[in-house]
């Protein structure tokens, strides 16, 4: 079925109107995500929205109507199973409370090669675990009892998709089999998807929770009295909080993955700069500036690589992880410098280096899980929603950021209390 046939089918099922009703407005929006389907014969995906405004007699004796599916929601034609949806809905007025707006959500599911069936919100997982697709239809009616004007809105869309049904640019992990969020037509739809359950839900919320937590921590830290935390320390720490909040908030529903990687690179560079600044702050000016400049150059290089479209492909996932790890490992050089000048004991006793080691371990662990796609590689289809590698990577990064904050705050307070020697 090509896009023209989809439009015709959708119009056929929704063009019925009540006798005596005068149609004032009837607008339909159909967005086809694969316009080349008529040439290639591939499956297509359709986002369908229709708004109908009619004037009906206010003294009508119509009875409450029903919602029905769309002729089994367009079964296969021409040997290709269609990805398009339509919905035949008819709402009739008659009761006293129908002047209030109505909102009904209907859900349909189907197994592979099967017909669509209507399900309720309490459908048991056992009956739904083998389903291939879920279709969600929003039906809204706004009726004015005084004017007789009725506005009906129908919106049909897929809630989740299988991996094979995603466009190529979203096929990043073939071990996540079901529950993918489809391409959405607007930012509003992307934002609403925060509250739905799909493969990106855990990725979104691990970052959003971290963002809120760091924002609250920043508010507490920056509002401390100056006799506890001096103003210049607040200014310097504000850069750390800005980096932590930005990397935590970078997983909005519409954020491209390359922007996320560039934000992670900025945060990694920020971490190393803080190590150099706090551990060498009482030392000669030149080495500290040299290390900070070195990290800035490496960070810019990592951001450039992260924003390069070529590295957005799934096959470069290990390369992306290696860039992230390499950026973090740049902190080894100032650490070796400190060991040479002050020894290992001072590194741990005066600079809380054990916390920075824990931070590095969490970074490496998260990057390794992300690069190897563990554990979903060993359990395909079992980690589609929870405990997938990307979620674990985000969790490791957020925890590492809190560990990093604690470590550098200990280093900063030790410097303020003049516990580190000046040379």
Curated annotation (Swiss-Prot):
Record-linked SMART domains: PAC
Cell location: Membrane
Segments on the Cytoplasmic face: 1-201, 253-288, 342-351, 414-423
Chain segments annotated as transmembrane: 202-222, 235-252, 289-309, 321-341, 352-372, 393-413
Biased composition (Basic residues): 104-114
Predominant location category: membrane
Stored Pfam families: HlyIII
One MF annotation (Gene Ontology) recorded for this entry: signaling receptor activity
Entry membrane topology: Multi-pass membrane protein
GO cellular component: plasma membrane
Coiled-coil region(s): none
Protein family per UniProt: Belongs to the ADIPOR family.
Protein name in UniProt: Progestin and adipoQ receptor-like protein 1
Species this chain originates from: Caenorhabditis briggsae
């Amino acid at each position: 079925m090509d896009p023209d046939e989809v439009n015709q089918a959708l119009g056929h099922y929704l063009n019925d109107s009540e006798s005596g009703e005068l149609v004032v407005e009837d607008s339909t929006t159909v967005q086809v995500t694969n316009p080349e389907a008529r040439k290639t014969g591939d499956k297509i995906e359709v986002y369908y929205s229709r708004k109908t405004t009619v004037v009906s007699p206010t003294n009508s004796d119509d009875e409450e109507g029903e919602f029905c599916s769309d002729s089994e929601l367009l079964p296969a034609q021409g040997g290709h199973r269609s990805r398009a949806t339509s919905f035949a809905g008819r709402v009739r007025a008659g009761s006293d409370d129908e002047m209030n707006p109505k909102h009904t959500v209907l859900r349909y599911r189907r197994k592979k090669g099967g017909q669509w069936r209507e399900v309720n919100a309490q459908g048991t997982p056992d009956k739904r675990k083998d389903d291939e697709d879920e279709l969600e239809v929003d039906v809204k009616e706004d009726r004015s009892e005084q004017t007789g004007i009725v506005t009906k809105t129908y919106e049909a869309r897929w809630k989740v998709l299988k991996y094979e049904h995603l466009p190529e640019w979203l096929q990043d992990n073939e071990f996540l089999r079901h529950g993918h969020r489809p391409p959405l037509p607007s930012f509003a739809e992307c934002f609403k998807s925060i509250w739905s359950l799909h493969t990106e839900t855990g990725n979104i919320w691990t970052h959003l929770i971290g963002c809120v937590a760091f924002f609250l921590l920043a508010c507490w830290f920056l509002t401390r009295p100056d006799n506890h935390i001096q103003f210049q320390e607040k200014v310097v720490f504000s850069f750390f909080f800005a980096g932590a909040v930005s990397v935590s908030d970078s997983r909005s529903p519409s954020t491209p993955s390359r922007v996320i990687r560039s934000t992670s690179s900025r945060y990694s560079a920020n971490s190393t700069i803080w190590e150099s600044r706090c551990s060498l702050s009482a030392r000669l000016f030149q080495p500290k500036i040299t290390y900070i400049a070195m990290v800035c150059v490496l960070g810019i290089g990592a951001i450039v690589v992260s924003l390069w479209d070529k590295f957005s492909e799934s096959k470069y996932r290990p390369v992306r992880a290696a860039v992230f790890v390499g950026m973090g490992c740049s902190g080894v050089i100032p650490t070796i410098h400190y060991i040479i000048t002050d020894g290992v004991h001072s590194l741990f006793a005066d600079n809380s280096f054990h916390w920075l080691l824990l931070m590095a371990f969490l970074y490496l662990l998260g990057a390794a899980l992300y690069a190897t796609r563990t554990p979903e590689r060993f359990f395909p289809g079992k980690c589609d929603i929870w405990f997938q590698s990307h979620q674990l990577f985000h969790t490791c990064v957020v925890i590492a950021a809190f560990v990093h904050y604690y470590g550098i705050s200990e280093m900063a307070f030790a410097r303020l209390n003049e516990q580190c020697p000046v040379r």
